């Protein structure tokens, strides 16, 4: 039994489509605090700011471990934590904070190419064994009109998604192509999940 440490409807739907019916328990992790701690640790060590892949992996780890700490091994075999961020135009962004932020994101994304990173962190409940990895895919954005962007934002869909877009919903019409695993762009990579589960045995 998989316990999904995420409230993402896209991740849940992806697993269900693949024949997996997970339980869901949302973590109480303070994402900003996790990223701040990661940045401070690297700065103290004289290292560069964390990459997008390092950021999503840190968040996926924090979410999975938070849920694992309060999970009885009889309730789940594996806890799965995920987090996604879009890297575009030299910036790394998660969910937009409001409609104005989403609109500004689309001004940057329109006609451009970005990389969607999704971190995966698995914890085996019985003994705490872990497996982790990052799925990254290149996303080529179309050039929707301002009217289309306004209507899309008014739908509310992009406000709950990393990068302010989806490929499995209304936003799919504005995506010209993807190089990489489309499931990873939705929020959970099925091929990577399979490999990580195999690593755990």
Regions found by a protein language model. Give the residues of each.
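GST superfamily/GST-like fold recognition
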Residues: 1-19, 112, 127-129, 136-201
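N-terminal polybasic phosphate/anion-binding patch
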Residues: 1-78, 199
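Residue-level signal for inorganic ion chemistry
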Residues: 15, 60, 83, 102, ...
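Acidic/polar active-site rim loop that often engages polyanionic ligands
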Residues: 38-44, 87-88, 127-135, 178
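Short, well-ordered amphipathic alpha-helical segments that serve as non-catalytic structural scaffolds
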Residues: 59-67, 105, 149, 189, ...
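Active-site-adjacent loop/tail segments of enzyme domains
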Residues: 78, 84-114
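Short beta-strand and adjoining strand-loop segment in the mid-core
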Residues: 91-97, 134-142
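Anionic-ligand binding region
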Residues: 99, 103-111, 119-132, 136-137
